[in-house]
């Protein structure tokens, strides 16, 4: 990540997420892997792109090379909107998350995302180089995201916003069928 504003925002996201991390961590869509490197526990960062210090590169985040119920915490920080097969990836996250584990998701609302990325594009080499791919969306509204997460087998246990309401976060648990 080459732009200073992007680094500041990433640092803010990490600051919001870190207190919720427990046990073994999997960061899906880890980018530069800064969250895992900032965590004091054991963690693995995975991404479909080699942004830098990624632990595991995968072709498809819906096919993770981990056993069932491996991780205590899974994070998707500013990631889910960039994943075209997001429902399958959420189901895969559910598979590798322990029954007592937590999923933590941060997301920018789509209207704010369009404005922000439009302003930022001239000085963000990563965004200009990579661009938006088919199936990616600018973000999710809170109701859209909560519905997607619920349909994928997750229940919200805590939610909030940060960056003056321009980003939202969700802490979720698995809905385990009886």
For the regions a protein language model found, what residue spans apply to each?
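Conserved N-terminal segment of class I S-adenosyl-L-methionine
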Residues: 1-62, 160-169
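Short conserved loop adjoining the S-adenosyl-L-methionine
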Residues: 63-68
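A conserved beta-strand element that flanks and buttresses the S-adenosyl-L-methionine
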Residues: 75
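Short catalytic micro-motifs in class I SAM-dependent methyltransferases
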Residues: 78-82
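A short glycine-rich, Lys/Arg-flanked "PGG" loop and its adjoining helix->strand segment in the class I
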Residues: 87-99
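Conserved class I S-adenosyl-L-methionine
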Residues: 104-126
């Amino acid at each position: 990540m080459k732009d200073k504003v992007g680094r500041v925002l990433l640092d803010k996201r990490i600051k919001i997420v870190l207190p919720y991390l427990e046990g073994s961590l999997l960061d899906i869509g880890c980018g530069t892997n800064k969250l895992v490197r900032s965590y004091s526990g054991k963690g693995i960062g995975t991404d479909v792109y080699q942004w830098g210090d990624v632990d595991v590169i995968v072709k498809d985040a819906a096919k993770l090379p981990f056993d069932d119920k491996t991780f205590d915490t899974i994070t998707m920080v500013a990631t889910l909107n960039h994943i075209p097969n997001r429902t399958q990836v959420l189901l895969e996250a559910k598979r590798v998350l322990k029954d007592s584990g937590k999923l933590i998701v941060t997301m920018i609302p789509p209207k704010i995302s369009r404005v922000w990325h439009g302003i930022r594009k001239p000085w963000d080499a990563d965004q200009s180089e990579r661009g938006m791919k088919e199936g990616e969306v600018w973000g999710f509204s809170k109701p859209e995201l909560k519905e997607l997460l619920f349909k994928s087998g997750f229940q919200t246990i805590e939610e909030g916003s940060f960056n003056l309401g321009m980003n939202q976060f969700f802490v979720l648990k698995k809905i385990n069928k009886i």
